[in-house]
Design a protein with these regions (language model features):
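Terminal accessory carbohydrate-recognition/targeting modules of carbohydrate-active enzymes
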Residues: 1-238, 242, 269, 291, ...
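Non-catalytic C-terminal accessory modules of carbohydrate-active enzymes
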Residues: 46-76, 83-87, 497-507, 512-520, ...
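Aromatic-rich carbohydrate-recognition surfaces in CAZymes
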Residues: 109-110, 131-134, 143, 205-207, ...
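Inter-helical turn/loop segments and adjacent helix faces that build the functional surface
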Residues: 223, 338-350, 419-436, 490, ...
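Catalytic cores of carbohydrate-active enzymes
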Residues: 244, 363, 370-373, 414-523, ...
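Glycine-rich, acidic and aromatic/proline-enriched surface loops and short helix-turn segments
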Residues: 248-256, 300-308, 572-579
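Carbohydrate-binding/catalytic loop surfaces
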Residues: 256, 260-273, 311-330, 334, ...
Length: 619
């Protein structure tokens, strides 16, 4: 579950909502139950509505944003409203691991008797759809402790709306028609809906008094709401510097199911838990902020999913796209990072069996789309269906049809073989160690023969029956950044220099060089236009993490100041796009606007991991 909106509380996306929850009884999507809660200040019979909605015809109502005097989110989002002599503070916090939003209203100042009125706007719809006025929606509600519960449609959970203070609920059902979401308009989607308001809550408030509102799929003890809110605020990391913003963002990707399984969400607001994203982001989101325990919890769930896949059993975990051919390779990389943090002995004890099983599974050629060829390289078919992280499709076909020998797959494979060979030696499994070393040697030799070209960079993918792909893409950086590289030091430096000249931006690496054909750096416009641009020049911060790791590997401390300057581009982003986090991607040309999902796990993770690497190289 999540809560998401703009700082003036005007929803601009269909994904926005005050309480957005999964409803597994219906489908695998999140659903907006409570779209917004409009507060109205009443004094001497005069009403001042603090809400804000955009309606068709570019009309905004009731324009409550004009009363906002301050906004900050150092710990939790806090808005200060001034209406004449009334000063009202609103603080919002989402209860960790619960489907509950809490809002605390504090009357900071008032010179007359003051009443607050709260009008909830209900949607009860999927984040992928809109709702409109209809006769099917139920208007029934039941009174609960200091509030009500209601449910608009069968199959949905009840929505409990409760306050910490006694109040009067006035049943006055109505539909607010033509609410419009401009960001959906920009993307060429349907953009308006109708929202249902069952009535309003009303209560008096004294100067200095605080009232807590709770919206959830379960009832709460209203006597505990004040303490519950205070406890949640106490647990939050302050956003008082760049690092703390990232730590706070990292925790937002933590996901726990009712079965107590632990996952990493790929991003907000529309991404689920994806296998590749999980393993790439897991080290940065946990190990880089000294949270090894959560790494182990996620890996416990992920390991179960990996074994189910490798053993051909029905998949029971909620980690999607586990069948993608490079997922197993990224799992090895994630465990490799764990070993560097906790020591190889503990890592071997916990994960040696999983590592060996993954390597043996690949060697046995059991992965349906990861075939080990006689030259020691891995081959994947990606012409008809995208199989790498560059997975955008248009008209049913991959925009970037990466197929054959894919550069990062084979860099990861070489790294995995070398890492597991060392592990096998440490465990006394000399025969396995020798086999892994032999395969790594063959893979490394073939890698150089296959991918290195006369211009000093690497082919992105090579289909033996076709000409190699000459596009300059960032995937070659992994062959430099990984602990074990099949390239010579001179070749590594050459690859890094090409990435620096043609791909580096203040927001990460471009997905395609401006000198290559098909360069399209602007991620704007309708869906098809964005699909074609997705991996054709846009900049990705998570790739920048591996670039900076490669820089430190090749140039050591001499590049520290350069990398610190690069990090400024991400620090600036803390007050852009989505406050306190990093979005999915950026335009590949200045001014490098943030685009896509408002918060992306791999980006946050790799920036955190880069900060950690900087500290290690400094000392």
């Amino acid at each position: 579950a999540y809560s998401c909106s703009t700082i003036v509380d005007c929803n601009t996306r269909k994904y926005h909502g005050l309480l957005v929850v999964p409803v597994p009884e219906l489908d695998d999507e999140n659903h907006v139950l409570l779209s917004s809660l409009d507060a109205t200040v009443i004094q001497h019979g005069a009403e001042f509505n603090l809400g804000l909605h955009k309606y068709q015809g570019n009309n905004y109502s009731p324009k409550g944003h004009k009363y906002i005097r301050e906004f900050d989110c150092d710990k939790v989002p806090t808005t200060l409203y001034r209406v004449g002599g009334v000063v009202l503070k609103k603080e919002v916090v989402f209860q960790h691991y619960e489907d509950r939003i809490l809002i605390r209203y504090t009357l900071v100042d008032a010179h007359s008797a003051t009443t607050l009125r709260f009008r909830p706007f209900l949607a009860f719809r999927s984040v992928r759809q809109f709702t409109h006025e209809n006769t099917v929606a139920s208007r029934e509600y039941s009174e609960v402790e200091k509030g009500i519960k209601t449910c608009m449609y069968a199959g949905y959970p009840d929505l409990y709306m409760q306050f910490s203070k006694d109040n009067k609920f006035v049943f006055m059902p109505d539909w607010y028609r033509g609410v419009e979401y401009p960001k959906e308009q920009e993307r060429g989607y349907a953009s308006n809906e109708d929202l249902y308001v069952p009535g309003y809550f009303e209560m008096n408030i004294e100067k200095g008094e605080s009232i807590v509102f709770s919206a959830s799929t379960s009832a709460c003890d209203t006597a505990e709401l004040q303490q519950l809110f205070a406890d949640e605020v106490e647990e939050r990391s302050p956003r008082d510097n760049f690092f703390h913003c990232l730590v706070n963002a990292a925790h937002q990707f933590h996901n726990r199911t009712k079965k107590d399984e632990r996952y990493i969400l790929a991003g907000y607001p529309w991404f689920k838990c994806r296998a590749r994203d999980t393993f790439i982001s897991l080290p940065g989101l946990t190990l880089s902020i000294e949270e090894e325990d959560y790494f182990e919890l996620v890996m416990e769930t992920a390991s179960r999913g990996l074994y189910e896949f490798m053993e051909g059993k029905p998949l029971t975990t909620k980690m999607y796209e586990i069948e993608q051919p490079d997922v197993l390779l990224w799992a090895v990389w994630a465990i490799q990072q764990y070993a560097k943090h906790v020591g190889r002995e503990k890592c071997n004890r916990k994960y040696s069996k999983l590592l060996c099983d993954i390597i043996d599974y690949i060697i046995a050629d059991k992965q349906p789309n990861l075939h080990l060829k006689d030259n020691g390289l891995l081959y994947s078919e990606g012409k008809e269906k995208a199989v790498t992280w560059m997975n955008s499709t248009a008209n049913g076909h991959p925009v970037v049809p990466r197929t054959g020998y894919i550069v990062e797959f084979n860099a990861l494979w070489y790294n995995a073989l070398k890492f597991c060979a060392v592990m096998a030696t440490e465990l006394g499994a000399d025969a396995e160690a020798a086999e892994y070393e032999k395969r790594a040697e063959l893979c490394g030799s073939s890698f150089v023969d296959t991918f290195v070209n006369q211009y000093g960079y690497l082919f992105d993918y090579v289909e033996p029956k076709d000409n190699p792909d000459w596009s300059v893409r960032p995937n070659m950086i992994f062959a430099v950044a990984l602990d074990y590289s099949p390239l010579s030091p001179a070749q590594q430096k050459s690859v890094l220099d090409v990435c620096t000249r043609e791909l580096l931006t203040p927001k990460g690496l471009r997905s395609l060089s401006p000198k290559s054909g098909g360069y399209n750096p602007m991620y704007v416009g309708p869906q098809t236009q964005r699909d074609y641009a997705y991996h054709q020049g846009t900049a990705w911060p998570w790739l920048g993490g591996f670039y900076m790791e490669a820089c430190l590997k090749i140039y050591k401390r001499t590049r520290l100041s350069f990398i610190e300057r690069q990090m400024v581009g991400y620090e600036d982003e803390m007050v852009q796009h989505c406050v306190g986090t990093i979005p999915e991607l950026f335009d590949g040309n200045p001014p490098f606007h943030g685009r896509g999902a408002i918060s992306f796990a791999m980006n946050v993770a790799e920036v955190l991991r880069t900060l950690e690497l900087l500290e290690k190289y400094k000392y």
